[in-house]
Amino acid sequence: MARVALVPCNSYDEEKVFAAVQTGVNLMGGISAFVKPDEKILLKPNLLSKALPQRAITTHPAVFSAVARLLREEGYTHISYGDSPGSPTATPQKAAESCGIGEAAQKYGIALADWMGA
C-alpha cells in the first residue's frame, strides 16, 4: 500500500524543512514503518547535472539534509547517497558538490555510492 503525506513548507530554511519532513514521515507511521535500523539505505537526490539549488533541477540540499538528519537522529547508520547524472560531463561527485548535496552529505557523514565508476 502506498503512503503519501502532503505537508506545506514555504521556505528552504533548514529547520522549517526538517519540521515538515519529520511531520510528513510521522503522519505515515514514522521512519521505522519503511526501513529497519540495520538496513542499508541509499538516498537518491536526483543529481541530474551540476546545477545550483536555485535552478530547481536537483533535490534541494535542505530537503536532503532534513532526510539525512531524520535518519541519523533515529539511529540509522548504513546510509549512502548516489545517482547517475544525465550529463556526460557531470560525475556524481561534481554534481553533488555543485548543487549543495555534497556539503549536506558530509555534514551527516553520508558517503557517495559512486556506481558510475564501477
Say what each PLM segment does:
Residues 1-118:
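N-terminal and secondary-structure boundary signal
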